[in-house]
């Protein structure tokens, strides 16, 4: 059998990239083929994604594969969750692809809770309340632009929309469907009774398919543009679900942090925990690969340090900022999950203000600011570990950190110190790796998720950080 290449298109809020992979001597070999910028743009008074430009970038990266003579056997696209497009009867897009950080959802939680209480909604879906969830975004469309919903014949989440543009076929991938807060964790299908109650048109919701499902080949038009045909296979299209699929552990009960702009900290469950205590701890039950549940908590993550770097130290690398922070003696803490840090005018000033208001030492230098943020994050991780252990009744021996934050050495050291658990960091490219692993399982190159995780552990460098306890 010749060498099979697999293509993951992994698009995040600030950039996207095409990662090719093949198997060599039982290991996954990764190669970045193309990288492109992304970001929200202001249009018609809203923050939106330029999905037309993004699709052109997807095609550009595919052409690069052809130029390199590395034609993928299959490809799959993952992006952030919750955002969607509406299509009319001719499959034309209605309006813009509005972004989750847009303010149109303000007050929409109250509209939803007028129809179903917050507690009942959690019992039905098991999904943590985030004001940007699709359920609130659709309520914003219904309230503010009802004509769009009346005109709509299909709703596609962003990665499903790109898969549709490639193949002409509409499907809804499971992991991303769960983030809408409109899916039933027991049936693994849309909660049509909830959808009817909310007054959303039932016919716009596509059939839900598992990761690994083959959507189809490229349409004739796309084949002409890129110069080849290949299968389009559903990865876990929610980027965090792909990252968690790449957690390199064989433990049945493992604790992970998918560490990037957000830190998603949790474990995998076979069944969702939609209990009231889970709701009160703001835990979520998002869908994972093979119908596992990602029982996790959203934590602010590296967004704060990214913002401070941009404002106060654009010329320093994150490694240098880590090194500066490790030399500081400042002991001030902030609540990293405070809404004030979501999108402040100036993160540097906001952190200083929070320290001043709580009567603590005010950080002055970049090193001090970074130290406050890293210590505060590690302390938050420690509290979250305690919550998860109390809710699941399981004591976890170590923490697996995957994603870009696996490179934040000082933060990893602090995480081990504050949690009292050993930390295993890597792979940093977890999202692309999980996307690729799902394709390789579908192709029969890897037996199942357990085999894929064993292969990932062999293929990529991991760093261990020992706790003192």
Label every model-predicted segment.
Residues 71-79, 154, 207, 391-403:
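Short glycine-rich phosphate-binding loop at a beta-alpha junction
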Residues 43, 63, 67-100, 125-132, ...:
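Short beta-strand-loop/turn "lid" adjacent to the catalytic site in phosphate-handling enzymes
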Residues 192, 198-211, 436:
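A conserved helix-loop-beta module that forms one wall/lid of the active-site cleft
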Residues 98, 102-115:
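Short alpha-helix plus adjacent loop in nuclease-associated cores
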